[in-house]
């Protein structure tokens, strides 16, 4: 059963976006559905059940709004964010960016856990932004004193880590726990047979 204090809004276009917001107050930060309704990006697809979490992030975190808006304003990239629960993966999340002729890019953000999703989404979206800015991770990973680390074919940046932590702090613990709880519930429903 849904939380009695929640109001859900579905917006359909080329993408389905579901945003849930507390219906008790009227501040922009407590009504992510209104923010998302005005700011749905055609080049960013957020898969079920992450839409309410992203809506909350957009309404509460100026840092995430900046990253999201930067990516949304680009015509040369398409981003997909999806939850793919997998306990056998050695990482919690991964972003794969592919480049095509003409400068087009496709970024696939996959979260393999329902833990710390606010932090992970922000962290991975910052990696997309880094790539759009032309960050050369391979070159930086071998530079002395660099904030980029290489692990086999994967890279990690201090900027991504710090952005994830900052957004999680801006969103706040209560909203993060609510998001994680709804994801666990949705995962149980979506993956139970």
Give the location of each predicted region.
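C-terminal motif of bacterial Sec signal peptides marking the signal peptidase cleavage site
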Residues: 18-19
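Auxiliary, metal-adjacent structural segments of Zn-dependent hydrolase domains
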Residues: 33-103, 110-115, 161, 166-173
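Post-HEXXH active-site segment of zinc metalloproteases
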Residues: 115, 119, 131-164
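Long, well-structured alpha-helical subdomains associated
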Residues: 162-193
């Amino acid at each position: 059963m849904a939380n009695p204090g929640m109001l859900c809004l579905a917006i359909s276009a080329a993408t389905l976006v579901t945003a849930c917001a507390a219906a008790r107050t009227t501040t922009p930060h407590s009504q992510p559905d209104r923010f998302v309704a005005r700011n749905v990006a055609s080049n960013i697809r957020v898969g079920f059940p992450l839409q309410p979490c992203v809506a909350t992030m957009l309404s509460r975190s100026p840092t995430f709004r900046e990253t999201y808006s930067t990516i949304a304003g680009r015509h040369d990239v398409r981003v997909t964010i999806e939850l793919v629960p997998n306990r056998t993966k050695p990482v919690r999340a991964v972003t794969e960016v592919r480049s095509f002729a003409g400068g087009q890019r496709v970024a696939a953000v996959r979260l393999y856990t329902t833990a710390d999703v606010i932090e992970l989404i922000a962290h991975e979206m910052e990696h997309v932004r880094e790539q759009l800015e032309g960050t050369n991770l391979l070159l930086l990973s071998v530079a002395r004193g660099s904030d980029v680390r290489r692990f086999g074919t994967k890279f990690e940046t201090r900027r991504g880590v710090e952005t994830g932590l900052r957004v999680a702090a801006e969103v706040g613990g209560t909203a993060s726990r609510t998001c994680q709880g709804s994801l666990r519930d949705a995962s149980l429903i979506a993956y139970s047979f």
